[in-house]
Amino acid sequence: MEEVLDLYAEPPDPQQPLVCLDEKPVVLHAPTRPSLPSSPGHPARIDYAYERVGTANAFLLVAPSVGWRHAEITERRTHTEYAHCLRYLVDVAFPQASRIRVVQDHLSTHDPSSLYATFPPEEAHRIRQRLEFHYTPVHGSWLNMAEIEIGIFERGCLSRPLEGLVDLCQRTAGWEAERNAQRRTIRWQFTTPDARKKLARLYPDVKSELD
């Protein structure tokens, strides 16, 4: 926990940007009957009966200090999709950075081995050399600032039923462009001293052990 909090407390470094990564499964629903458009004297009528038409996965990448985020929509959530997100970070999002510090949870696919399971060894090694991984504690996903952005993503893209993967991708692209144009940053205020005071129960009682 303190490793992540100390990282958040550091001043921004353009050569070593901090990026928080998380993902969310998405259920795709389509209306069972088409909506009726409005007509003179009558409002549009929307049928609220929907059927499930599939699932997708949304990767959220957030650089909290610079107001940048990227949402990658995939049909599956395997090590392959995760590895491609890492390559996007290195080659597209921050090509000039010497090292990208990635905060993420302990999901089984969130591991450098996913790179080697996806790309040739030389390519996997190239990407891995540019990344530095930091993990939130088990049951401590609230420490990942990407979760804040996921909540905003849900309200912006998932509050209405989705008719399919294309609909989700279109909504996501519009949401991402709008959010990045706003350049909204995240100011994390919970610090290591706060954790030692407010979450003291999570620390071992060293004094008692020495008595």
What are the language-model segments listed below?
Residues 1-87, 199:
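Extended, low-complexity cationic-aromatic segments
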Residues 19-21, 101-104, 134-136, 189:
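Short beta-strand segments
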Residues 32, 167-177, 181-211:
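C-terminal domain-tail junction helix/linker
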Residues 45-51, 123-145, 160-163:
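RNase H-like polynucleotidyl transferase catalytic core
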Residues 80-101:
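Short, basic/hydrophobic alpha-helical segments
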Residues 97-111:
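Acidic/histidine-rich, metal-coordinating catalytic segments
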Residues 138, 146-164, 178-182:
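Active-site proximal helix-loop segment of RNase H-like, two-metal nucleases, encompassing DDE(D)
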